[in-house]
């Protein structure tokens, strides 16, 4: 039992209604969140002489306080529980580390609707289709739609400024609604309807309508139109034959689970209207001693009930594990979706084959992850020895990227005991410094990163600075000046200087801003881990810098030309159909723009080319 908490007095005050409880340690940190149909009965079970398992025993020893929130129903309690888990990330709960929203295909409600990739909250008016397991899958689908149905995919800002069609029109991927007379309103809306039907899985309706139109065109002797529609029919048929995998037209999520060596993998197979859209593997954080049933139960709850993810709920969820709270989860999901959602654990036929596939994928992904972790863990141990630390649970690395001091971007990448934590990678746009001053850039990013309150688990054990003694000295100065509530002495600051000719394996490490550095053997596992985090940081920084530089280049190219003000910029973009066509235009073409003289056209052409 716990000496920190007078549970007997507390239990006297607890109601038998449904609700949610939050357990705190001595530091006031939430360490566990749970829900109960009967709060008194559930909380009493924690303080019996014989607790359920080792995890519960460890949890109870750390309880210093319990807060209770009473709810009207058990369904309300379930929803609130998962909201609290997401908010507090308690260390004794199973945690789904998935803070990225799923990509969807968005069909806007504009006069001429556009197709686009969408993530996050559904604020914009229109229709949303998905979810897709990753951005690659959704972009592949958009590229396919562009080949089948010539509906625009350009941004509204580009669409409104066109006076002639773009390249997509020239190659038959867009019908050109931006330019009057290229496509009728009726025909464009018909293609939009085809997209809507196709994304809803109603391929046969699309084919039926196209066949009817082809026959009508042929009867009216419009043979060119009939041939064009015939080609569209053949393209749609090819796609549907390739993608159709089941006679079942319902939406399914199929969830397979594998568990070994304290690590769980949950693999989700997304099936929409008989088509496999893709799949994704998840590795939830599992506290020691947690039962597999709790892992699956909590995963399903967090995956579907944490509403900010923007997921579209399927009509049915298939599991290879029987949930103790299946009915409660199903009713909660049905209430959330506004329609009936079923959870099945003993499917037959095609569903059973899907489940076997999901289970196989989970096992394969788990084997791969365990192999990777074995390597990472070995490297972590070697690095801890080199740096004379007891253990390393979290590392962060910083790098600076710029071109001649312009568009400076700093990156921070994070590794934990299992390797890269990409959801915590960050970029920082650097401003207000002398161009090219890497020391000032490093000082700025470190102040922004660490000059604030941090949770204990977010304080790194090691901070790598990409650079030599100068960069490391800046880091020491920044940390000396920090006035923060957390232990700023905890992180070990390490400078990583590149070797001669920037060759891998010749890096020099510095633990102090003065004195000599030291090198590790080229085959050292510790060095390989340092190279891994350093390279990730470098790539993250340079990618951000290139994106920023490209954006500035494209937006400022015209602004820097003398004699080209806002009105002329607008006229140039509208007449030429965008910035890229303007870059490719000749002097004669530019001179045709209203308000642009021959001399100014030459100046614009020379400025854009050079």
From Swiss-Prot:
Q: Does the keyword DNA repair apply?
A: yes
Provide the Gene Ontology terms for cellular component.
Answer: cytoplasm; excinuclease repair complex
The entry lists its GO molecular-function terms as: DNA binding; excinuclease ABC activity
Entry-linked Pfam families? GIY-YIG (PF01541), HHH_5 (PF14520), UVR (PF02151), UvrC_RNaseH (PF22920), UvrC_RNaseH_dom (PF08459)
Q: Does the keyword Oxidoreductase apply?
A: no
- List, for all copies, the residue spans of the domain called GIY-YIG: 16-94
- In this chain the UVR domain maps to 204-239
**Gene Ontology biological process terms, A to Z:** nucleotide-excision repair; SOS response
Oligomeric and partner information: Interacts with UvrB in an incision complex.
Q: Which PANTHER family match?
A: UVRABC SYSTEM PROTEIN C, UVRC/OXIDOREDUCTASE
Homology family: Belongs to the UvrC family.
Protein name per UniProt: UvrABC system protein C
Gene name, Swiss-Prot/TrEMBL: uvrC
């Amino acid at each position: 039992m716990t000496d920190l908490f007078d549970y007997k007095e507390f239990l006297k005050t607890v109601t038998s209604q449904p609700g949610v409880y939050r357990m705190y340690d001595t530091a006031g940190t939430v360490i566990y969140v749970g829900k109960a149909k009967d709060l008194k009965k559930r909380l009493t079970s924690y303080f019996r002489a014989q607790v359920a398992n080792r995890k519960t025993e460890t949890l109870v020893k750390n309880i210093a306080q319990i807060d209770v929130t009473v709810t009207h129903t058990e369904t309300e309690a379930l929803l609130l529980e998962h909201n609290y888990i997401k908010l507090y990330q308690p260390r004794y709960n199973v945690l789904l580390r998935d803070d990225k929203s799923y990509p969807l295909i968005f069909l806007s409600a504009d006069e001429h609707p556009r197709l686009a990739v969408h993530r996050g909250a559904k604020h914009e008016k229109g229709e949303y289709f998905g979810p897709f397991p990753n951005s690659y899958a959704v972009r592949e689908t958009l590229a396919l739609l562009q080949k089948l149905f010539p509906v625009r995919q350009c941004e509204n800002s580009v669409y409104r400024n066109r006076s002639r069609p773009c390249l997509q029109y020239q190659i038959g991927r867009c019908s050109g609604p931006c330019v009057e007379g290229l496509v009728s309103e009726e025909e464009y809306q018909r293609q939009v309807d085809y997209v809507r039907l196709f994304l809803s899985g109603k391929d046969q309706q699309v084919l039926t309508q196209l066949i009817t139109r082809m026959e009508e065109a042929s009867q009216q002797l419009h043979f060119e139109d009939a041939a064009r529609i015939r080609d569209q029919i053949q393209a749609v048929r090819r796609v549907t034959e390739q993608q159709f995998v089941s006679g079942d037209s319902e939406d399914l999520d199929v969830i397979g689970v594998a568990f070994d060596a304290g690590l769980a993998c949950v693999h989700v197979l997304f099936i929409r209207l008989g088509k496999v859209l893709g799949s994704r593997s998840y590795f939830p954080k599992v506290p020691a001693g947690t039962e597999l049933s709790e892992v699956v139960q909590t995963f399903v709850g967090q995956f579907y009930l944490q509403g900010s993810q923007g997921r579209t709920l399927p009509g049915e969820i298939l599991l290879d594990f029987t949930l103790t709270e299946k009915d409660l989860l199903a009713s909660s999901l049905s209430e959330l979706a506004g329609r009936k959602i079923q959870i099945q654990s003993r499917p037959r036929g095609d569903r059973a084959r899907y489940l076997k596939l999901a289970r196989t994928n989970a096992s394969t992904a788990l084997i791969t992850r365990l192999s990777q972790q074995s390597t990472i863990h070995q490297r972590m141990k070697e690095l801890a020895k080199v740096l004379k630390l007891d253990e390393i649970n979290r590392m962060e690395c910083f790098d600076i990227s710029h071109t001649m001091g312009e568009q400076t971007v700093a990156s921070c990448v994070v590794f934990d005991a299992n390797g890269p934590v990409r959801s915590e990678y960050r970029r920082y746009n650097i401003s207000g410094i002398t161009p090219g001053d890497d020391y000032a850039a490093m000082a700025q990013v470190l102040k922004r990163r660490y000059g604030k309150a941090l949770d204990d688990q977010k304080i790194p054990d090691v901070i790598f600075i990409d650079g030599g003694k100068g960069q490391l000295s800046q880091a020491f100065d920044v940390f000396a000046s920090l006035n923060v509530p957390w232990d700023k002495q905890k992180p070990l600051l390490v400078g990583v200087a590149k070797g001669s000719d920037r060759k891998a394996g010749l890096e020099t490490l510095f633990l102090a801003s003065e004195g000599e550095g030291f090198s590790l053997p080229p085959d050292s596992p510790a060095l390989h881990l340092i190279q891994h985090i350093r390279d990730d940081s470098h790539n993250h920084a340079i990618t951000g810098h290139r994106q920023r530089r490209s954006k500035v280049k494209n937006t400022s190219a015209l602004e820097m030309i003398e004699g080209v003000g806002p009105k002329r910029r607008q006229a140039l973009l509208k007449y030429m159909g965008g910035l890229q066509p303007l870059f490719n235009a000749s002097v004669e073409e530019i001179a045709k723009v209203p308000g642009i003289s021959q001399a100014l056209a030459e100046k614009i052409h020379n400025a854009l080319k050079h």
